[in-house]
């Protein structure tokens, strides 16, 4: 049984019409001969932040397991809405969430790590139905408790499902068609990268690029899953970037939600850095108000929980990074407008003809 694996990010679901559009796309894929489809979905845009805010309003010290269970509601709601939209088109459809997907993790709530998979439940659903809607970014631990795989980790769910079903490709749909040399929302001159290697895009993700989750890319590399980045528009599907074992590109990334964690001593910083490194979290050594610190650009909630303790202070910042095959330059900027301005300047230095090239294409 050949299965098509698709993942739709929250930007596809700005309202009820988004679910209708995705459902129609699934119907078109089936009409084109793709009989079995798994569609992994994220929560509606802004839903996860809203759920977290509600939880913390009730209890600022809510347990990590309690938070994970609450955050999973966003994807579960999205699954129900898409299942309803697909069912209305007369397609046989079922849905699975973290409890039933067959993905087991450790108990690192907030950013759990996949430990084992069991494809029997999802294979059974595909035997009975033509489309299976799967909740992204969630699984269960060995005790059967819901776990959250991390922010934007629905990509990881899609890659894991592709691998566990023996498929070697999955499609990721977001509001941009692919990976670019910079965020096109803030750098209009950014150039689309047709093909890029796993390690290159994983590094971009760790330094702030939002197109793909770094954990998904790393899992895809280990299990030989090709990722195709696409965008679903009113005019159809736009294919942008294929992520495989080959390809590199210079880029400028902007991490808008980075945090700076300051410590009482250099020794304490070094100890906490080692802990974060063990958990695969990229950090940069910084000095903040004459105190040694670490800047964290991804998995920030999980990182802050790992290093929490007395004598620690936390602040926010933005990080602009130039990524090159031989050079990595990092700039910490406190103001968003200045960060965007710097990113555009650095991109222009990196690709001096980009503006003219885009105008020429237009």
Spans of model-derived segments:
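A conserved regulatory-domain signal marking ACT and ACT-like small-molecule sensing domains
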Residues: 241-362
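A residue-level signal for beta-strand positions that form part of recognition/binding surfaces
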Residues: 131, 224, 258-260
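Conserved dinucleotide-binding and phosphotransfer motif residues
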Residues: 89, 223, 279
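Short linear loop/turn motifs
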Residues: 100-104, 233-238, 288-291
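Nucleotide/pyrophosphate-binding catalytic subdomain
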Residues: 1-217, 264, 306, 315-317, ...
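A conserved active-site cap/scaffold subdomain adjacent to cofactor or substrate pockets
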Residues: 202-256
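Generic beta-strand/beta-sheet core signal
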Residues: 135, 173, 230, 284-286, ...
């Amino acid at each position: 049984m050949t299965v098509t694996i698709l993942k739709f990010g929250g930007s596809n679901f700005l309202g009820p019409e988004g679910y209708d559009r995705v459902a129609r796309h699934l119907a078109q894929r089936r009409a084109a001969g793709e009989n079995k489809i798994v569609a992994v979905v994220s929560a509606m845009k802004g839903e996860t932040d809203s759920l977290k805010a509600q939880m913390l309003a009730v209890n600022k010290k809510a347990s990590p397991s309690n938070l994970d269970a609450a955050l999973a509601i966003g994807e579960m709601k999205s699954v129900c809405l898409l299942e309803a939209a697909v069912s209305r088109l007369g397609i046989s459809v079922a849905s699975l969430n973290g409890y039933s997907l067959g993905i087991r993790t450790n108990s690192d709530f907030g950013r759990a790590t996949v430990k084992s998979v069991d494809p029997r439940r999802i294979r059974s659903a595909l035997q009975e139905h033509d489309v299976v809607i799967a909740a992204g970014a969630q699984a269960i631990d060995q005790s059967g408790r819901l776990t959250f795989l991390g922010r934007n980790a629905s990509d990881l769910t899609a890659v894991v499902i592709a691998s566990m079903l023996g498929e070697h490709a999955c499609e990721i749909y977001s509001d941009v068609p692919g990976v670019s040399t910079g965020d096109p929302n803030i750098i209009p001159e950014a150039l689309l990268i047709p093909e890029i290697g796993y390690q290159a895009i994983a590094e971009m993700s760790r330094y702030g690029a939002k197109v793909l989750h770094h954990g998904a890319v790393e899992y895809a590399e280990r299990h030989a899953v090709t990722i195709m980045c696409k965008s679903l528009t009113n005019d159809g599907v736009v294919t942008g970037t294929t992520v495989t074992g080959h390809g590199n590109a210079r880029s400028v990334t902007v991490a808008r939600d980075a945090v700076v964690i300051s410590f009482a001593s250099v020794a304490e910083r070094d100890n906490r850095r080692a802990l974060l490194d063990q958990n695969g979290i990229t950090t940069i050594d910084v000095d903040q108000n004459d105190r040694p610190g670490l800047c964290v650009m991804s998995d920030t909630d999980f990182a802050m929980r790992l290093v929490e303790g007395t004598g620690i202070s936390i602040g926010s910042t933005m990080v602009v990074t130039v990524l090159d095959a031989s050079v990595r330059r990092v700039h910490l900027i406190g103001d968003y407008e200045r960060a965007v301005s710097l990113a555009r300047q650095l991109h222009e230095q990196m690709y001096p003809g980009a503006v003219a090239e885009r105008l020429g294409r237009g």
